[in-house]
């Protein structure tokens, strides 16, 4: 079993009767995830976009197997588009009682949807959320070239509310004829609008997804904005709101300098010119590939699975936690400052020097494709190398 990293101590605070613990290192996230499953006594619910049958996947597989042998009910949902691991890999666990479902896109509107959510829940008592998947590259270190990401452990009454959402989503996933209208109903029924901790969701709804509406609404009154966005290609309306904060207060964005999809970097850079003009500070994270999804708006935090891009805003099934708490926001601003210190400041002069006409054309084309097509398509086209 992997050991928790000693370089990043757990950061933990209580908010509205729930214990929130931030996990910043890949190895400590994997250790915490395995412990969550091993400590379960009644139920384990897992939901991931990617599940790869590598070393990390095997460790989680074995933890699920141990849970099943203890008599724990175990459920696993993965996405067909994101997870290439064949169903046969999980067959021995299914034979032992695993409830296994795969989000299958079909032709029509449902084909466009990805189940991009990530969570691991035990006993309706504790849940781990974040942007990471089940794959070695999400649990390593910067020296390994692993993704930089975040995990958040939530322990308390908020977990039971999320469990009911999971069960409704699992029922819809197992129904191959499930209607988009039914899915919309699930998203809106479980989306929360009150309290210090609010579960907010995304999906194929009309207009912005509920989580995106909450974020956009919070932006309107914000004076101090900090965003870490691995894939940054939002709507022009959201870009304008960020720009207004840049003019009247302070707005800072950390985007990726490294990725496995160069088109997403180019698409983000396409937005820089207008943001820099409005006083927004932009940084690119240097140590390794960036996968973090974090928004800090004054004393409000949005953290979870969704990128600030068109798919995350309108289409993908996403899960975010909105946290309204000054102490927790202060802790997250401290984390943000640490990431800024490891990032390259993008000045207007630097952006101009590295943005010739051909580069600008590639950026515009990448922005168009990222906001209209699937990431897999842009990754295969490899447009963003420049």
Residues covered by each model-derived region:
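Charged, low-complexity intrinsically disordered terminal segments
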Residues: 1-386
């Amino acid at each position: 079993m992997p050991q928790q990293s000693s370089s990043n101590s757990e950061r933990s605070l209580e908010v509205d009767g729930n214990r929130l613990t931030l996990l910043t290192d890949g190895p400590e996230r994997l250790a915490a995830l395995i412990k969550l499953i091993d400590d379960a006594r009644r139920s384990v619910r897992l939901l991931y976009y990617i599940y790869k049958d590598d070393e990390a996947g095997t460790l989680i597989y074995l933890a699920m197997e141990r849970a099943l042998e203890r008599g724990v009910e175990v459920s696993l949902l993965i996405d067909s588009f994101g997870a290439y691991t064949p169903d046969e890999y999980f067959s021995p666990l299914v034979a032992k009682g695993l409830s296994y479902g795969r989000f299958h896109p079909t032709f029509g509107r449902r084909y466009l949807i990805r189940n991009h959510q990530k969570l691991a829940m035990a006993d309706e008592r504790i849940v781990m959320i974040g942007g990471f998947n089940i794959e070695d590259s999400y649990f390593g270190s910067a020296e390994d070239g692993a993704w930089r990401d975040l995990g958040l452990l939530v322990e308390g009454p908020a977990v039971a509310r999320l469990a009911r959402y999971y069960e409704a989503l699992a029922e819809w996933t197992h129904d191959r004829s499930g209607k988009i209208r039914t899915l919309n109903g699930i998203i809106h029924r479980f989306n929360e609008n009150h309290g210090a901790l609010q579960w907010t969701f995304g999906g194929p709804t009309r207009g912005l997804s509920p989580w995106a509406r909450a974020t956009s609404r919070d932006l309107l009154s914000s004076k101090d904005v900090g965003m870490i966005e691995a894939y940054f290609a939002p709507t022009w309306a959201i870009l304008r709101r960020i720009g207004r904060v840049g003019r009247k207060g302070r707005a800072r964005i950390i985007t990726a300098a490294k990725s496995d999809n160069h088109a997403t970097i180019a698409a983000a850079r396409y937005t820089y010119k207008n943001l820099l003009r409005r006083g927004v500070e932009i940084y690119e994270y240097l140590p390794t590939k960036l996968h973090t999804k974090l928004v800090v708006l004054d004393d409000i935090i949005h953290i979870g699975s969704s990128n600030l891009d068109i798919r995350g805003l309108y289409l993908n099934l996403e899960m975010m936690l909105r946290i309204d708490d000054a102490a927790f926001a202060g802790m997250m601003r401290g984390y943000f400052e640490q990431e800024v210190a490891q990032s390259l400041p993008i000045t207007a002069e630097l952006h101009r020097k590295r943005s010739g006409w051909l580069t600008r054309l590639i950026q515009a084309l990448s922005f168009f494709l990222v906001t209209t097509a699937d990431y897999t398509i842009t990754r295969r086209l490899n447009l963003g190398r420049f």
